[in-house]
């Protein structure tokens, strides 16, 4: 019944172990205030639940256009970035043409490419998690139809060199995934709205609205018109559109303040983790850290026993014994620091 292609696929897995402190999914640890949730109840009262949502997300596009400083016609609203990735792979080039992907990176690029049967052209990363120029050149020589660049890269946390992204743009359609833009400030949006050969993806998930599943694909107006032909009708729910629009319109300053707190915690947490024996902490431009330890399975399980959930990413290429840790609230980060110190004492006595 299923195709050979589907039989070979591996499902994307997330960490679901229940823990008191969740530092595994790169979420904003701050929930909406109760007063804001009460305001959203009023928003819900105005929703006609018997009607389909606006297929063009008109009002939300207008709100996002102000946030991203582009025109509404430069935006397609998606049900999370994953939907945008699928449309891009379907719409750019032919299905038998390859996808350029740095490795390791966000796994969904590979998952969706494999689901569609598209060849994958890997670009190895060096010890600083920058693209290896030799393997990059080899990948480009295979003439991929599209490239996906997570910038900052998930799970390594670093920004890629501008010169490498510029080289990729010269050879193929380039998608810059800026899911973590708010934590670094580096963007290619101004290029994307002028260049028909590139696009930018954004999401509301990492800034505190993960439950709404709202993403945005940004490009030239002509590009958005064409790629929108692939979009499923009513792809973003009425409730997600209405709530995202209300929160961004009325409470974006609160979200920006939370981001500032997380960036401050990023500096503090980096110093604290670096002082713990047996842990190598990599620099990060995102809301998470990548650490290297001697035994990731042991550390990961030990943290779970202490009620702290992190992400063991040892299954990714070249990341054996690496763990990704989301930046939490101060008290959560303190609990993490203390737990790792206790584990380190047990291991290195």
Swiss-Prot record:
Its EC number is 2.6.1.9. The keyword Plastid does not apply. It is an enzyme of class 2 (transferase). Its cofactor is pyridoxal 5'-phosphate. One of its GO terms (biological process) is L-histidine biosynthetic process. InterPro entries: Aminotransferase_I/II_large, HisP_aminotrans, PyrdxlP-dep_Trfase, PyrdxlP-dep_Trfase_major, PyrdxlP-dep_Trfase_small. Keywords: Amino-acid biosynthesis, Aminotransferase, Histidine biosynthesis, Pyridoxal phosphate, Transferase. Pathway: Amino-acid biosynthesis; L-histidine biosynthesis; L-histidine from 5-phospho-alpha-D-ribose 1-diphosphate: step 7/9. Gene3D superfamilies: Aspartate Aminotransferase, domain 1, Type I PLP-dependent aspartate aminotransferase-like (Major domain). The modification N6-(pyridoxal phosphate)lysine is found at residue 206. GO terms for molecular function: histidinol-phosphate transaminase activity; pyridoxal phosphate binding. It catalyses: L-histidinol phosphate + 2-oxoglutarate = 3-(imidazol-4-yl)-2-oxopropyl phosphate + L-glutamate. HAMAP family: HisC_aminotrans_2. Belongs to the class-II pyridoxal-phosphate-dependent aminotransferase family. Histidinol-phosphate aminotransferase subfamily. Homodimer. This is Histidinol-phosphate aminotransferase. It comes from Hydrogenobaculum sp. (strain Y04AAS1).
């Amino acid at each position: 019944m299923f195709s050979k292609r589907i039989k070979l696929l591996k499902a994307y897995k997330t960490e679901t172990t229940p823990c008191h402190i969740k530092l595994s999914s790169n979420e904003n640890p701050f929930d909406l205030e109760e007063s804001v949730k009460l305001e959203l109840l009023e928003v819900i009262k105005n929703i006609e639940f018997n009607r389909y949502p606006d297929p063009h997300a008109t009002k939300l596009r207008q709100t996002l256009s102000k946030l991203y400083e582009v025109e509404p016609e430069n935006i397609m609203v998606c049900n999370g970035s994953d939907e945008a990735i699928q449309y891009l792979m379907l719409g750019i080039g032919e299905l038998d043409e390859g996808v350029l992907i740095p490795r390791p990176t966000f796994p969904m690029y590979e998952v969706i490419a494999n689901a569609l049967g598209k060849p994958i052209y890997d670009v190895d990363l060096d010890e600083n998690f920058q693209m290896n120029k030799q393997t990059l050149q080899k990948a480009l020589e295979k003439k991929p139809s599209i490239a996906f660049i997570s910038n900052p890269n998930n799970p390594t946390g670093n920004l890629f060199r501008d010169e490498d992204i510029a080289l990729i743009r010269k050879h193929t359609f380039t998608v810059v995934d800026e899911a973590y833009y708010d934590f670094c400030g580096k963007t290619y949006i101004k290029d994307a709205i002028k260049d028909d050969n590139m696009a930018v993806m954004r999401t509301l998930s990492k800034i505190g609205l993960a439950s709404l599943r709202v993403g945005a694909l940004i490009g030239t107006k002509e590009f958005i018109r064409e790629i929108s032909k692939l979009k499923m009708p009513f792809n973003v729910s009425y409730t997600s559109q209405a709530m995202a629009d209300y929160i961004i319109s009325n409470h974006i300053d609160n979200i920006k303040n939370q981001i500032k707190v997380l960036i401050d915690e990023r500096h503090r947490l980096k110093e604290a983790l670096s002082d713990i024996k047996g842990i190598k902490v990599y620099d990060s431009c995102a809301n998470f850290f990548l650490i290297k330890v001697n035994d990731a399975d042991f550390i990961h399980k030990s943290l779970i026993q202490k009620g702290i959930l992190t992400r063991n990413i040892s299954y990714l290429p070249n990341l054996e014994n690496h763990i990704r840790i989301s930046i939490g609230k101060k008290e959560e980060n303190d609990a993490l620091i203390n737990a790792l110190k206790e584990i380190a004492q047990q291991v290195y006595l």
